[in-house]
Amino acid sequence: MNITTAPGLIGRSTQAITPGYMSGFGNSFETEALPGALPIGRNSPQRAPYGLYAEQLSGSPFTAPRGSNERSWLYRIRPSVQHSGRFEKAEAGLWRSAPCHEHDMPIAQLRWDPPPLPQRAQTFLQGVETMTTAGDVNTQAGMAAHMYLISASMVNQHFYNADGELMFVPQQGGLRLVTEFGVIGVAPGEIAVIPRGVKFRVELIDGPARGYLCENYGGGFTLPERGPIGANCLANARDFLTPVAAYEDSDTPTELYVKWGGALWVTQLPHSPIDVVAWHGNYAPYKYDLRTFSPVGAIGFDHPDPSIFTVLTSPSETAGTANIDFVIFPERWMVAENTFRPPWYHMNIMSEFMGLIYGVYDAKPQGFLPGGASLHNMMLPHGPDREAFDHASNAELKPVKLEGTLAFMFETRYPQRVTVHAATSSTLQADYAECWRGLQKRFDPTKP
């Protein structure tokens, strides 16, 4: 193995790093697709190796505290400024941004069936369908919950989102996310997060794909504090994977789409923007297998708050009040004694958008299907349907393993407003509230 050195600088291997992933969350990573492509001991040398351009991508202000300062240095074949002419407005389809007041639907608990896969060729940019928006994209607060329906890979098209980071939650079909930092493969049961400003394209792996997409306008997702839980369990940092460098040296013209200020814009590039040969820093895309989440729960009695299932959180300026919490309900043992084990009836200051990746959700055994969604907005009551209540109220309280299920929730401090598309969709269940109508009056003052 050859080692290059310079006066006063630490030597570094010139052997190319093996393709794949690097483990860890929020690490200061470094990776090179060609040996020696990373400058040693400095970020912006007079002449970068291989004739590359040094470019910094900042995910936080320069003066952010060290613990929350995010940036990466990219060493690329051409700088990002090299695009052709001005950006022009592009058709955004069904993609909407907050604030979105296009529909004044009466407040209600809502649930949708899974949307059908497209019958025509439809790329990622054509297949995003916004369900709800919350907050304000212009103040960098809030989120949008989308579905994506894809039947064709992006060819000679690339995209980045200046409005927020994107969390992909596949439900059917795998995706290949070709980013300027490297390649991420993501399948149902996994998530992938693409930070604000990172260029990428979406390719299909095994046929048409359907899934959920969270657009986070606020602070980047991070691991929640564990508090008294301690140093282990929930989502462990070692299970997050960031791609190693991979690049394309292609002079084929491509379209570059940018979401900025709630609108979609497009310009032309004379080359592929996936041309980063090496990079280092802590601002990068990543993936996570939700099945590595280590849940904690009640081992005596009662049902704890769903916050114990938080995978990632986007904090707000108010401690303990999230811009977004990403929560999952995975396989787990239920052992609590003398306890109603499903989630209890609830009214919440937070607004909850839920999806089901596979299996059956224990509080809604009927009607909530994989690929479907529900919305329980702030201070609107929700909880188990009659079937779940009757079963859990009379079940033998032996240890039970909840298997073959994976549901999730995007929970935000902001009210979620429903788009016209979501409010008028044929998948909207008109009879959702009927699932609670059968709950009987059980009160008897003579029987404590």
Curated annotation (Swiss-Prot):
UniProt KW Metal-binding keyword: yes
Leading EC class: oxidoreductase
Catalysed reactions listed for this entry: homogentisate + O2 = 4-maleylacetoacetate + H(+)
Active site feature: H303 (proton acceptor)
High-level lineage: Bacteria, Pseudomonadati, Pseudomonadota, Alphaproteobacteria, Hyphomicrobiales
Cofactor: Fe cation
Pfam families in the cross-refs: HgmA_C, HgmA_N
Source organism (scientific name): Rhodopseudomonas palustris (strain BisB18)
Gene: hmgA
EC number(s) on file: 1.13.11.5
Assembly: Hexamer; dimer of trimers.
Keyword annotations of the record: Dioxygenase, Iron, Metal-binding, Oxidoreductase, Phenylalanine catabolism, Tyrosine catabolism
Binding site residues for Fe cation: H346, E352, H382
Name under which the protein is recorded: Homogentisate 1,2-dioxygenase
